């Protein structure tokens, strides 16, 4: 059975838009994916007919909203094969999830003189929180470098690991290069050295199945808006014994069991101890609908379709003169490039005139830009709704820019 691309595209209302008098070719899903009708409708339905404050409400609407929220927690656990829904913490997104781990686990279990390892290809969200921890607590940040082909130089990992390595934080798929890192093997190496491992799944979650138990990672983080869900909602997966040992990062309502001005605070169990205040319940409902959508479409089918589309795109882009591609031969979801000596901003601006949306800049990965000696790159990204015709339009647009501007 062939991939139902026309039906899929019909599910996403914004794809019918025009930009600058041209049909929209949305090639910026790595930044944020479009939303299907089912996600938009589920969030709207919740606010129209089901909304109430969750937790401890005595009335029916509150109890139902709480049950619906916890049902999505169960759904997330199933989606990534967590051992328990109590290993799922709702956060605003990947960035907050990493900051939570850095501030709760990091400030408790990583001591002055210890070290942690990140990689040269990380998004700033998986660099800056660890640098802040290092500055505040005298922790060393070690960096696993890139190899020449755009993959990680994983042979250097055993060199970086030692008895004082407390954590490895690594992206599963690079948001710039599309590199699929061998995280399962890296996790095993790090854990053998006594370190815990955080996997940034912001890019991988939309392109392939994720099984946190098979990976044996300690933490896994992702954002809802990358997987066709709402903005402002994300997930921190953490092994239950680790979450239970970690102190809360933020204080307030919902994360306590008892508060006394005389005897102090008793915190709730995880995951609720990490969910202070009123949650984004509408976003949580939309996230659940997004996971339903991806599951119904079939994650293996998505992976096969996008892999075929990537090969088509890479072959088609060879027709563009003076195009430099960055990253490994085999990549997932994103294609980073520059056209001649032209600034990425200029290339992206011309493509926008043609109705083609890409991302330009440093992609929150300045160390990666420094590695390649460029200030910025263009990035086109694929999703469940991307077509070969859109790739053809990208190629034609780049050829047109080259004719207009030269090298």
From Swiss-Prot:
Pathway: Cofactor biosynthesis; iron-sulfur cluster biosynthesis. Its cofactor is pyridoxal 5'-phosphate. It catalyses: (sulfur carrier)-H + L-cysteine = (sulfur carrier)-SH + L-alanine; L-selenocysteine + AH2 = hydrogenselenide + L-alanine + A + H(+). GO terms for cellular component: cytoplasm. Keywords: Cytoplasm, Lyase, Pyridoxal phosphate, Transferase. Its EC number is 2.8.1.7, 4.4.1.16. It is found in: Cytoplasm. Its main location: cytoplasm. One of its GO terms (biological process) is cysteine metabolic process. GO terms for molecular function: cysteine desulfurase activity; pyridoxal phosphate binding; selenocysteine lyase activity. Homodimer. Interacts with SufE and the SufBCD complex composed of SufB, SufC and SufD. The interaction with SufE is required to mediate the direct transfer of the sulfur atom from the S-sulfanylcysteine. This is Cysteine desulfurase. It comes from Pectobacterium atrosepticum (strain SCRI 1043 / ATCC BAA-672).
């Amino acid at each position: 059975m062939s991939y139902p691309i026309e039906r899929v595209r019909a599910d996403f209302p914004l794809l019918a838009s025009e930009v600058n008098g041209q049909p929209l070719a949305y090639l910026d899903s790595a930044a944020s994916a479009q939303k299907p009708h089912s996600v938009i409708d589920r969030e709207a339905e919740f606010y129209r007919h089901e909304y109430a404050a969750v937790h401890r409400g005595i009335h029916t609407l509150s109890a139902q909203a709480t049950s619906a929220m916890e049902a999505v927690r169960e759904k997330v656990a199933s989606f990534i094969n967590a051992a328990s829904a109590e290993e799922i913490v709702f956060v605003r997104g990947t960035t907050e999830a990493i900051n939570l781990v850095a501030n709760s686990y990091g400030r408790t279990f990583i001591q002055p003189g210890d070290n942690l390892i990140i990689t040269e290809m990380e998004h700033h969200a998986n660099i800056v929180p660890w640098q802040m921890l290092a500055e505040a607590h005298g922790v060393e940040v070690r960096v696993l470098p890139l190899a020449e082909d755009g993959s990680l130089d994983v042979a250097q990992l055993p060199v970086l690991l030692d008895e004082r390595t407390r954590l490895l934080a690594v992206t599963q798929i690079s948001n710039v290069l599309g590199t699929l890192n061998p995280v399962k093997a890296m996790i095993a190496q790090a854990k053998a050295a006594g370190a815990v491992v955080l996997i940034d799944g912001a890019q991988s979650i939309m392109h392939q199945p994720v099984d946190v138990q098979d990976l044996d990672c300690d933490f896994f983080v992702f954002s809802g808006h990358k997987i066709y869900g709402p903005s402002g909602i994300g997930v921190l997966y953490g092994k239950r014994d680790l979450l239970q040992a970690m102190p809360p990062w933020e204080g307030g309502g919902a994360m306590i069991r008892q508060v006394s001005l005389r005897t102090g605070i008793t915190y709730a169990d995880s995951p609720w101890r990490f969910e202070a205040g009123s949650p984004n319940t509408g976003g949580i409902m939309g996230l659940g609908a997004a996971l339903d959508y991806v599951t119904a479409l079939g994650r293996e089918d998505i992976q096969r379709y996008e892999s075929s589309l990537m090969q088509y795109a890479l072959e088609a882009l060879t027709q563009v003169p003076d195009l430099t591609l960055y990253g490994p031969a085999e990549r997932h979801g994103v294609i980073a490039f520059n056209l001649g000596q032209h600034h990425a901003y200029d290339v992206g601006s011309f493509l926008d005139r043609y109705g083609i949306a890409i991302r330009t800049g440093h992609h929150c990965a300045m160390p990666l830009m420094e590695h390649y000696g460029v200030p910025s790159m263009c990035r086109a990204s694929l999703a469940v709704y991307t077509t070969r015709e859109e790739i053809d339009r990208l190629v034609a647009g780049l050829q047109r820019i080259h004719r207009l501007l030269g090298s």
